[in-house]
């Protein structure tokens, strides 16, 4: 059980989870732009662009952010 907890705490993989109009982004590098219909951020050498409607920031931590809103497009750009 302790091993599972340590693995969870030490997990550095990027994750993007979208469910029920909630977008949970874990282990991002840097937030670039935050608008009500557009969010962009860096993950290592990639840029993630999220377009949507009524995108509202619900939680902001050093390595995680939670958005609420309808996603209309998601784009990954090599930078």
Spans of features found by a protein language model:
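N-terminal intrinsically disordered, cationic/polar leader segments
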Residues: 2-79
